[in-house]
């Protein structure tokens, strides 16, 4: 039977009626939810011409939750009036009543009460009239009794303004008998089973029409991984600071752009196979800007631009070796080289957030593939002070305000600084980034003007994400062992939104 007992009741009531039934009135008579009757109507409609149902919309007035309370207990102003004894009541005490603030204002405008500000113990409230009529309660009781039409438009408007009354649209069905009306309806099949097909019984069974407009179950999708959430926050911060995103689609990079262009010598330990993934095929880069390559070679082997260089035999074959980039600073080098070819020079602010690769032993805190965040600013006369100022602005936007700087060494920056922040959870200072001013030996061979300085800084994406989501093992954040439920449940993350002052001890 379509929709079970409710549909049966509907058909029996419809058989006994002369013209038809209103679904809302039927629900009230049967003492059930209107939606249950509507469901039965729609189920019977699916059977064909058993019934006819006309959708009707009617407007009516209903009391809000506050309006229901006032209809029972009286208006706020009436309650305030009744609470004032003949000798008056201190205004401060009156305001502490649940209806005090609203009721006092309305009672004053109705001229039911007055305030004597000359009283010794402070302003005191007295009655002005001996009695009053609570018109608000009376009007609301009329609405509750189904007599809202007795109220004028002005009275209804006043009640709506006080959010005591609401106009609602009630959608009901007027149900009448159809051309194929019957009180005994056979059950319609909703599934075609293998047994029906093999026996041929499907030919004699009625099937429920397929509803192509029905909404199916929405697929469980749209959950952002914690790394993507934090990455979006970093990216938004850079954009708010006026930075432009660099192209970082070169996962495979030549040793020239990854190392040599950064004034990193060819015998540096970082270029060893134990730290870098070198490619077997294609093993070498075929296209390099040879005029720039020659300037880099001369700087490495002979010096120049105020530098003695490294005094070794620089080899082009070594620079051609392809690898998986170990940092996104190679993308910064490419961007700065393109900038140097544009005349005249224009100050820029670049950033990038992308993956890098290191030949490291995998453990709870290290991966062979991770994300690097990098910011670069190029302008005339930039100094270490500018770098520290930009770093403070950047990390403050992250919610990290307690910063310390420690001198460090990088092959391609001088001076260089490590950035530390006090971590409340670990109760100690932790490194959150590295920074520095790019060396002239890196910038001048590109063709940048001598009075142009470039400040830069970088940090990983995984470390702050692990800290903020309370993850101790990086393999729980990235990789095939990640619990997808963690991705579904993870909330939006704000980095140290309410930082606290750190202790006074120096960073280690």
From Swiss-Prot:
<keyword id="KW-0648">Protein biosynthesis</keyword>
<keyword id="KW-0030">Aminoacyl-tRNA synthetase</keyword>
<dbReference type="InterPro" id="IPR006195">
    <property type="entry name" value="aa-tRNA-synth_II"/>
</dbReference>
<keyword id="KW-0007">Acetylation</keyword>
<dbReference type="GO" id="GO:0005829">
    <property type="term" value="C:cytosol"/>
</dbReference>
<dbReference type="InterPro" id="IPR036390">
    <property type="entry name" value="WH_DNA-bd_sf"/>
</dbReference>
<dbReference type="InterPro" id="IPR002319">
    <property type="entry name" value="Phenylalanyl-tRNA_Synthase"/>
</dbReference>
<keyword id="KW-0067">ATP-binding</keyword>
<keyword id="KW-0436">Ligase</keyword>
<dbReference type="InterPro" id="IPR004529">
    <property type="entry name" value="Phe-tRNA-synth_IIc_asu"/>
</dbReference>
<keyword id="KW-0597">Phosphoprotein</keyword>
<dbReference type="GO" id="GO:0005737">
    <property type="term" value="C:cytoplasm"/>
</dbReference>
<keyword id="KW-0460">Magnesium</keyword>
<dbReference type="InterPro" id="IPR040725">
    <property type="entry name" value="PheRS_DBD3"/>
</dbReference>
<dbReference type="InterPro" id="IPR045864">
    <property type="entry name" value="aa-tRNA-synth_II/BPL/LPL"/>
</dbReference>
<dbReference type="InterPro" id="IPR040724">
    <property type="entry name" value="PheRS_DBD1"/>
</dbReference>
<feature type="modified residue" description="N6-acetyllysine">
    <location>
        <position position="311"/>
    </location>
</feature>
<dbReference type="GO" id="GO:0000287">
    <property type="term" value="F:magnesium ion binding"/>
</dbReference>
<feature type="binding site">
    <location>
        <position position="438"/>
    </location>
    <ligand>
        <name>L-phenylalanine</name>
    </ligand>
</feature>
<feature type="binding site">
    <location>
        <position position="329"/>
    </location>
    <ligand>
        <name>L-phenylalanine</name>
    </ligand>
</feature>
<dbReference type="Pfam" id="PF18553">
    <property type="entry name" value="PheRS_DBD3"/>
</dbReference>
<keyword id="KW-0547">Nucleotide-binding</keyword>
<dbReference type="InterPro" id="IPR040586">
    <property type="entry name" value="PheRS_DBD2"/>
</dbReference>
<feature type="binding site">
    <location>
        <begin position="372"/>
        <end position="374"/>
    </location>
    <ligand>
        <name>L-phenylalanine</name>
    </ligand>
</feature>
<keyword id="KW-0963">Cytoplasm</keyword>
<feature type="binding site">
    <location>
        <position position="412"/>
    </location>
    <ligand>
        <name>L-phenylalanine</name>
    </ligand>
</feature>
<comment type="subunit">
    <text>Heterotetramer; dimer of two heterodimers formed by FARSA and FARSB.</text>
</comment>
<dbReference type="GO" id="GO:0000049">
    <property type="term" value="F:tRNA binding"/>
</dbReference>
<dbReference type="GO" id="GO:0004826">
    <property type="term" value="F:phenylalanine-tRNA ligase activity"/>
</dbReference>
<comment type="similarity">
    <text>Belongs to the class-II aminoacyl-tRNA synthetase family. Phe-tRNA synthetase alpha subunit type 2 subfamily.</text>
</comment>
<feature type="modified residue" description="N-acetylalanine">
    <location>
        <position position="2"/>
    </location>
</feature>
<feature type="modified residue" description="Phosphothreonine">
    <location>
        <position position="190"/>
    </location>
</feature>
<protein>
    <recommendedName>
        <fullName>Phenylalanine--tRNA ligase alpha subunit</fullName>
        <ecNumber>6.1.1.20</ecNumber>
    </recommendedName>
</protein>
<keyword id="KW-0479">Metal-binding</keyword>
<dbReference type="GO" id="GO:0051290">
    <property type="term" value="P:protein heterotetramerization"/>
</dbReference>
<dbReference type="Pfam" id="PF18552">
    <property type="entry name" value="PheRS_DBD1"/>
</dbReference>
<dbReference type="GO" id="GO:0009328">
    <property type="term" value="C:phenylalanine-tRNA ligase complex"/>
</dbReference>
<dbReference type="Pfam" id="PF18554">
    <property type="entry name" value="PheRS_DBD2"/>
</dbReference>
<feature type="modified residue" description="Phosphoserine">
    <location>
        <position position="193"/>
    </location>
</feature>
<dbReference type="Pfam" id="PF01409">
    <property type="entry name" value="tRNA-synt_2d"/>
</dbReference>
<feature type="modified residue" description="Phosphoserine">
    <location>
        <position position="301"/>
    </location>
</feature>
<feature type="binding site">
    <location>
        <position position="414"/>
    </location>
    <ligand>
        <name>Mg(2+)</name>
    </ligand>
</feature>
């Amino acid at each position: 039977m379509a929709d079970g007992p409710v549909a049966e009741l509907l058909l029996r009531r419809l058989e006994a009626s002369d013209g038809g039934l209103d679904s809302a009135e039927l629900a009230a008579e049967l003492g059930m939810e209107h939606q249950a009757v509507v469901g039965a109507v729609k189920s019977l409609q699916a059977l064909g011409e058993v019934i006819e149902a006309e959708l009707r919309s009617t407007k009516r007035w209903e009391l809000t939750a506050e309006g229901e309370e006032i209809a029972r207990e009286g208006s706020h102003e009436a309650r305030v009036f009744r609470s004032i004894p003949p000798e008056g009541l201190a205004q401060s005490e009156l305001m502490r009543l649940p209806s005090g603030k609203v009721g006092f204002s309305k009672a004053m405008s109705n001229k039911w009460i007055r305030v004597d500000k000359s009283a010794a113990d402070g302003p005191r409230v007295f009655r002005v009239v001996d009695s009053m009529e609570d018109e608000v309660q009376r009007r609301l009781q009329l609405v509750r009794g189904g007599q809202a039409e007795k109220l004028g438009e002005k009275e209804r408007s006043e009640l709506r303004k006080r959010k005591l009354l609401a106009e609602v649209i009630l959608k009901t069905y007027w149900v009448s008998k159809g051309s194929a009306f019957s009180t005994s309806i056979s059950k319609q099949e909703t599934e075609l089973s293998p047994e029906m097909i093999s026996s041929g019984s499907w030919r004699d069974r009625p099937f429920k029409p397929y509803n192509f407009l029905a909404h199916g179950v929405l697929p469980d999708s749209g959950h952002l991984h914690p790394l993507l959430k934090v990455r979006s926050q970093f990216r938004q911060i850079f954009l708010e600071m006026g930075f432009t995103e660099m192209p970082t689609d070169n996962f495979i990079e030549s040793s020239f752009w990854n190392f040599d262009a950064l004034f990193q010598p060819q015998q540096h330990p970082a270029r060893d196979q134990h730290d870098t993934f070198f490619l077997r095929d294609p093993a070498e880069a075929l296209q390099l800007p040879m005029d720039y390559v020659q300037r880099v070679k001369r700087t490495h082997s002979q010096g120049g631009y105020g530098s003695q260089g490294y005094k070794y035999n620089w080899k082009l074959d070594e620079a051609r070796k392809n690898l998986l980039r170990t940092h996104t600073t190679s993308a910064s080098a490419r961007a700065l080289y393109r900038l140097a070819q544009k005349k005249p020079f224009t100050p820029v602010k670049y950033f990038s957030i992308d993956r890098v690769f290191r030949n490291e032993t995998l453990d709870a805190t290290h991966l062979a593939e991770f994300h690097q965040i990098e910011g670069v600013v190029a302008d005339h006369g930039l100094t270490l002070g500018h770098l520290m100022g930009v770093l403070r602005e950047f990390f403050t936007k992250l919610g990290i305000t307690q910063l310390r700087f420690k001198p460090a060494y990088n092959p391609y920056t001088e001076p260089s600084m490590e950035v530390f922040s006090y971590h409340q959870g670990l109760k100690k200072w932790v490194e959150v980034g590295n920074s520095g001013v790019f060396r002239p030996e890196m910038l001048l061979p590109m063709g940048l003007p001598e009075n142009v300085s470039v400040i830069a800084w970088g940090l990983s994406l995984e470390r702050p994400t692990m800290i903020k989501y309370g993850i101790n093992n990086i393999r729980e954040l990235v990789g095939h062992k990640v619990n997808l439920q963690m991705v579904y449940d993870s909330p939006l993350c704000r980095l140290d939104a309410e930082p606290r002052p750190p202790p006074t001890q120096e960073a280690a």
